[in-house]
Amino acid sequence: MKKASIITYGCQMNVNESAKIKKIFQNLGYDVTEEIDNADAVFLNTCTVREGAATQIFGKLGELKALKEKRGTIIGVTGCFAQEQGEELVKKFPIIDIVMGNQNIGRIPQAIEKIENNESTHEVYTDNEDELPPRLDAEFGSDQTASISITYGCNNFCTFCIVPYVRGRERSVPLEEIVKDVEQYVKKGAKEIVLLGQNVNSYGKDFKNGDNFAKLLDEICKVEGDYIVRFVSPHPRDFTDDVIEVIAKNKKISKCLHLPLQSGSSQILKKMRRGYTKEKYLALVDKIKSKIPGVALTADIIVGFPGETEEDFLDTIDVVQKVSFDNSYMFMYSIRKGTKAATMDNQIEESVKKERLQRLMEVQNKCSFYESSKYKGRIVKVLVEGPSKKNKEVLSGRTSTNKIVLFRGNLALKGQFINVKINECKTWTLYGEIV
C-alpha cells in the first residue's frame, strides 16, 4: 500500500483541513503515516500568519530534497503559504509537484493522478473562488474532539493580517449541514465539538435567511448527548448580546471565551482597523462577566505594532490587568508582506519589541496564577483526555473553562466527564482528586 505523510503548520483550521487531506489520501488508497522517510507522498499544510512560518517551510522543503531524489516522493504544499506564493514556490523549489490553495484541496486526487501518470510535471491550483471548499467528513481522533469549520475566509482586513488575501472573502456553511455534522460526530463518540472560523461570530452575515451565530449555537446545543462546545476565534466587535445570552443559558457551551485584544491602545486599535476602542472592549468584558459568572477569558495580543509608543503599550498592560485574562497568546509584531501595516512608518525596533513582550508576559503570568488560584477547594466537571504527557500514571483533563486538571484515575475514564476536587493550583495547571 502506498503511504502519505501530512505535516501541519499553523492554526486549528489548518489542523482540521489536514484531517480532510488525510481523508482524501485514504480514499485514494493511501496509508497515512507520520514516517516521512517511507512516504510516497508528503504534503505540507502551511501557514503564513507569522514571519517565522516561511523559514520553517523552506527548511522542511530543503530536508525533503533527499527523499525526492531517493524515492521520487510526490511533494505537495497546501494552505495559506501555498495560496500566497503560488507558482513562485515551484520556481524556488523545483522538487514541489503540487501547490494547492486553501479552497482547492478537493482537486488533490486529479493532481496526484496527473503526476503519477507523468501527464504533468507540476500542478498549481490557487484559485480564490467564492464557493465553499468541499465538505469532507474528517475522522476525529482518539482524543474525542471533532472540529468543524463553520466559516471560511475573512472580511475584516486588519492592517497586520494576511488572512483575507489568502483565504478569500467570508463564506458561511449552511446551518443545517453544521448541525448534521455535530449529530454524526456525537453519535460516533465525540465529547468535544470545536467550531472553527477566522471570525466565527460573524457567521451568517452572508445569508439572507436570518441564521446567525447565536442561532447556530442554540441549534447545536439541542443535539442530544453529553459533550462540550468550544469555538475559535470570535471578534470582539461582533460579540453581540444574543450570543452572550445563548452562551450563558447553555451548559454545553464552554465558559472559556477567546476575545482577541491585539492592543489596549485605542490609537493602535484604529491603525489596526479592529473596529473597537479600549473602552468598548472593557465594556464588553464587563457585560460578559456579569452575564456569565465564572467565565474565563483569553486573548491574542501584539506588541510593537508600528507607531506603538510606551503610553500605548501601557494601555495594553492596563487592559490585561483590568480584565485579568486566564491566558494570553502574546506576539511581537512581524511584518507580513502585502498588508497595510508592512508599509507604515515608525516600525518598532526588535529590542523594544522583545523588552515589551517580556514585561507583558510577566503581567499575564501573575493574572494567570491569580485566576487559577480561585479553583482551590472547588469541585469541577472535567472531560478526561487521557494520560498526562509528563506522567503516564496521571490522567489529564479540561474544565469547561479550559483549565488543565491532573489527577489519578483509571485510563478507562478517558472520554468521560467526571467531578474532580481541586487541591492545588499552579499557573497553568490544577491538581486534584476524583470525587
From Swiss-Prot:
Keywords assigned by UniProt, alphabetized: 4Fe-4S, Cytoplasm, Iron, Iron-sulfur, Metal-binding, S-adenosyl-L-methionine, Transferase, tRNA processing
Xref: SMART domains: Elp3
InterPro entries membership: Elp3/MiaA/NifB-like_rSAM, Methylthiotransferase, Methylthiotransferase_CS, Methylthiotransferase_N, Methylthiotransferase_N_sf, MiaB_methiolase, rSAM, rSAM_horseshoe
Essential cofactor(s): [4Fe-4S] cluster
Complex formation: Monomer.
Family to which the UniProt record says this protein belongs: Belongs to the methylthiotransferase family. MiaB subfamily.
Alphabetized HAMAP family for the sequence: tRNA_metthiotr_MiaB
Protein name as catalogued: tRNA-2-methylthio-N(6)-dimethylallyladenosine synthase
Organism: Fusobacterium nucleatum subsp. nucleatum (strain ATCC 25586 / DSM 15643 / BCRC 10681 / CIP 101130 / JCM 8532 / KCTC 2640 / LMG 13131 / VPI 4355)
Lineage per the UniProt record: Bacteria, Fusobacteriati, Fusobacteriota, Fusobacteriia, Fusobacteriales
